[in-house]
């Protein structure tokens, strides 16, 4: 199936387990990215769905899937997630062919914990164009460590000078959002999802 080019959107943003403590990430992204999409659905809006904010991965995935449009409109959606929100959006994208996925601080491995394939095994089969922005001092996995996991060829990993909390100065957020917008523009170009 050929996906037509066009303006991306809406964008759906999912925070990490620490929501609302990590709301600063969405506050940095929304004003920089929102105007470039046909709508912005943030974590607070998703949490207002009956059931509220449930940190469980399966519950959040079901909540997100219920909020997504059906039919051709789905292929214009961009999913953005931070930390566990990144895990949710990638799992959903394995089932729902959206236009692009953006991950910030993907939680590859709990600090000091054992490998948990449930965190990353699905990434090997992800067919949606995906950008992972990973902090060089992220305790859940650096960009170098990320490349040792089985990643689909549709996934790109870019380094950010940051930790897992993504405490970035305004110019660094500007640069990160330019990367995201460039990636989404490329993903919006016509491409065949059948091959």
Question: Where are the language model's segments positioned?
Answer:
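Primarily recognizes the serine-hydrolase "nucleophile elbow" in alpha/beta-hydrolase
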Residues: 67-125
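Short, conserved loop/helix-junction motifs that constitute active-site signature segments
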Residues: 6, 96, 120-127, 149-153
């Amino acid at each position: 199936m050929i996906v037509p080019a066009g303006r991306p959107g809406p964008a759906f943003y999912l925070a990490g387990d620490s929501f609302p403590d990590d709301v600063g990430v969405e506050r940095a992204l929304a004003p920089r990215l929102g105007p470039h999409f046909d709508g912005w659905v943030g974590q607070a809006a998703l949490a207002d769905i009956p059931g509220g904010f449930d940190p469980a991965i399966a519950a959040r995935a079901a909540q997100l899937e219920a909020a997504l449009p059906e039919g051709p409109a789905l292929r214009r959606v961009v999913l953005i997630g931070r930390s566990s929100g990144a895990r949710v959006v990638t799992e959903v994208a394995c089932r729902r062919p959206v236009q692009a996925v953006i991950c910030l601080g993907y939680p590859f491995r709990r600090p000091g914990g054992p490998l948990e394939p449930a965190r990353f095994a699905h990434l090997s089969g992800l067919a949606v164009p995906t950008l992972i922005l990973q902090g060089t001092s992220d305790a859940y996995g650096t960009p170098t460590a990320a490349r040792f996991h089985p990643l689909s060829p549709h996934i790109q990993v870019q380094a950010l000078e940051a930790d897992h909390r993504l405490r970035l100065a305004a110019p660094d957020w500007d640069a990160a959002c330019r990367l995201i917008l460039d990636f989404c523009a490329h993903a919006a170009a016509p491409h065949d999802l059948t091959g």
